[in-house]
Structure formats: structure tokens, C-alpha cells
Amino acid sequence: MRALVLLGCLLASLLFSGQAEETEDANEEAPLRDRSHIEKTLMLNEDKPSDDYSAVLQRLRKIYHSSIKPLEQSYKYNELRQHEITDGEITSKPMVLFLGPWSVGKSTMINYLLGLENTRYQLYTGAEPTTSEFTVLMHGPKLKTIEGIVMAADSARSFSPLEKFGQNFLEKLIGIEVPHKLLERVTFVDTPGIIENRKQQERGYPFNDVCQWFIDRADLIFVVFDPTKLDVGLELEMLFRQLKGRESQIRIILNKADNLATQMLMRVYGALFWSLAPLINVTEPPRVYVSSFWPQEYKPDTHQELFLQEEISLLEDLNQVIENRLENKIAFIRQHAIRVRIHALLVDRYLQTYKDKMTFFSDGELVFKDIVEDPDKFYIFKTILAKTNVSKFDLPNREAYKDFFGINPISSFKLLSQQCSYMGGCFLEKIERAITQELPGLLGSLGLGKNPGALNCDKTGCSETPKNRYRKH
């Protein structure tokens, strides 16, 4: 009996190994696509002298620490927006974020762009939900895996603020260093697929908050869809709510397009726009790329030339982000400074109104509660709009200040007029000088303008709304 069992196991083993060999042979025989257009478009093979960005980045850090951060800390801006800027974030490479439902080809697309297929570097892929971690792909001299706890503890990296999401999340965060030329210029972030089944969504950490953290810091966001899975559920709706205000950075990708016939592809393209229309309330829709991002050749009798041109357009978008990394970084810090300035003006106005309404017999808590509950009665926001270079579109939500002052007593703040020193000057004047002169001047030093000093709020406005910084096709 034992001999029969052993014989059966041996036969099964031989059968399985034979199937595995056939599968490997099939994979080896599958024609691979020419990748030369990737290297050409991204200029990976060009021996260009590496630009020395360190001087500009050091100047940017100095402006932030000397002119912006003092006011930011004094008025506890981070507790309103929960976006703390670190030195690692200022000096970091552009970040490209991959989002979308499960098994739509996000990891496969990263493998394809980096040429990691059939190497020990490749990300695991499959038809089932395979990515349960946030995977950060960075450049390194050799293949190296970094635990999330180590990444969060390293202040030199831009991921130290992720520690606030708890140990359960850090166990789902992983960094991979790969010696690849593209990763010398950009960082890729692969994310867990969105699963509409609520029970499967019990991840043990604040998934949406973590996504928001990466969205706020991403320079380019690829939202990937599979043409056979276009269902838009609650989780996907939540994702697009988080993407509001980032429309200029979103690129929608209809992947695996060579699986469909022409007529069906047109129907799917229309269905995708129909499903996403209620979620993207902007005049100009995001760019949609239709292609198949994997190493195998396009299937026969499909629009191969179209798919290739779409892929090249996407690569040009990616290259624009890489080329404009310093310009985008300076613009990001300037937008942050504008928000900090408006927040400080609002807190100062709340405090001034509180002092004006207080009398010897007044109950301070009741007086300030009345101001916070109905700021329009005291013209808080209208007064700020009368200030120079403040747009109504930049004002924060009134409700946000109820929560803000709920944990920060008004008595803990000083008036802006009291935030001055003989040697250091006034906080407000320093941040306004950074917005109108120093940051535009730094931008002009990159050769973008003939008269950098002329770029100020009087001419350009201090709008916080991000412009479309990337070239559309």
C-alpha cells in the first residue's frame, strides 16, 4: 500500500514538473515587445551630465525654514491641514503613484516600465488580489528590501510622517531599492487594489488616510482600470473624492486594451467616462490612455499603432514630471506658504475679534463660542478677503476652525503684530516676502523667466489652486 502511495506521489510530481516546464517554455516562447521606445522617450541611455540640484534645494530649504516654518509653527497650521513638510520631502525625487481596483495591472505596469519581468526584482502579479502592501520602489546600488518601520525611522527619507498611521500600517509598508536608471530620477509607489467588498476591506489601518497622504505628495497619479471591471462602487467614489483638487496630476489608464475588439473597446471607453463623469467635476477631463502595459506583444488584429502612440504619450508625461522636478517643488512650497499665510491671517482675525468683544464682565468661553459658531456675523472671512492677495477660493472651510479651536484654545495664540523681533523681523512680512520675491526669484534662477523678480502676487495672484503643471496631449 505504501509503495502505491509513493508511486502515485512520484507520478504526480513528474506530471506537475512537466506542466511547469511547458508553462515556462510557453512563457519563453511568447514574443516580447520591443522596449527601445521606453529608453528613448525617457532618455535613459543618454550620457547627460547630471544636473547639480543641491544648491537650489538647499536654498529652498533655507527659505522654508527661515520664512515659512516660524509662522506655520506659531499658528499650528499642521493641526489644520495635517501636512507637515520635512527636509526629506523637500529634497525627494518626484513621486508617481499607482491607484486602482485589484488585479487591473498596476504591478505588471511597473514591472514593464522598469523591465523587471523574469528577474528577481519583479513585483508579484496575478489574477487574484496580490498586492496587500504599499510598495515604494527607489533607486539603490543593489537590490535591497527595507521594512516600513525602518523607512519611517529614517528622517533623511520623506516617509517619516507615515509613523502616525500606526504599527499595523508600517507592517504593510515596504521599500525596495533597485539599481535602475529610471529610479535615479523618480520614485514609484504601488498600492493595494481597491476591493469593494467591505469585509475584505478590513485592513487594520486607516487605508483612506494613507492613500490621502500619498496623493498629497504625488507628482503624477496613474489611476488604472481593467476594461472588464468598470464597476464604480463606494470605495472608488471615496478615492475620487480624495483626488479632488489634483485633477492636473491625474492620468487615467484603460489597461489591457488589446483584449477587446474595436467595437467593444469603444463601448468600454464610453462606459468608463459615463461611470467617472459624476466623480470628476471639472471642465477639462483628465487624460485617458488606452493601451496594454505588459511585456508581451500586442494581440493580432488590434490597434497596435494606436496603443504604442498612447504609451509613448504617457512616457512623455512621465518625462515632463522628471524634467520639471525643481519647478514643481518650488511651486509646491509656494502654495504651502500661501495656505499658511491665509491661516495665520484668519487666526489673527479670530483673536482680534475675541479681544474686541471681551469686557470685564464677559464669559470668555461663551464669547469665543459665539464667534466660532457664526464667524460671518463678525465678518471674519470677509475681513480677510479685503486683505491684499487673498482669493475667496483659497479660504479654508469654516467648519474646520470649529475643530481647530476645539483643541487649540484661542488664548494660546498671539496677534500677528506681536510676532516680531528687532533682529528677526516680523513673521508675516517674512512669509509674504518669500511668496512674492524669494520663491519666484528662485524659480527665475532656473531660467524660466526673463524677470524673476516681477513674478509676484500683484501680477499672478496668490491662488492656492494648483495649475495644470504638466503638458497635455
UniProtKB/Swiss-Prot annotation:
PANTHER family: SARCALUMENIN (PTHR43681:SF1), TRANSMEMBRANE GTPASE FZO (PTHR43681). Coiled coil: none annotated. This is Sarcalumenin. Belongs to the TRAFAC class dynamin-like GTPase superfamily. Dynamin/Fzo/YdjA family. The gene is SRL. The keyword Membrane applies. Residues 255-258 are annotated as: G4 motif. Residues 128-129 are annotated as: G2 motif. CDD domains: EHD. It comes from the Eukaryota. InterPro entries: Dynamin_N (IPR045063), EHD_N (IPR031692), G_DYNAMIN_dom (IPR030381), P-loop_NTPase (IPR027417), TRAFAC_Dynamin-like_GTPase (IPR051943). Residues 190-193 are annotated as: G3 motif. GO terms for molecular function: GTP binding. Glycans are attached at residues 281, 389. Keywords: Glycoprotein, Membrane, Sarcoplasmic reticulum, Signal. The keyword Lipid biosynthesis does not apply. It comes from Homo sapiens.
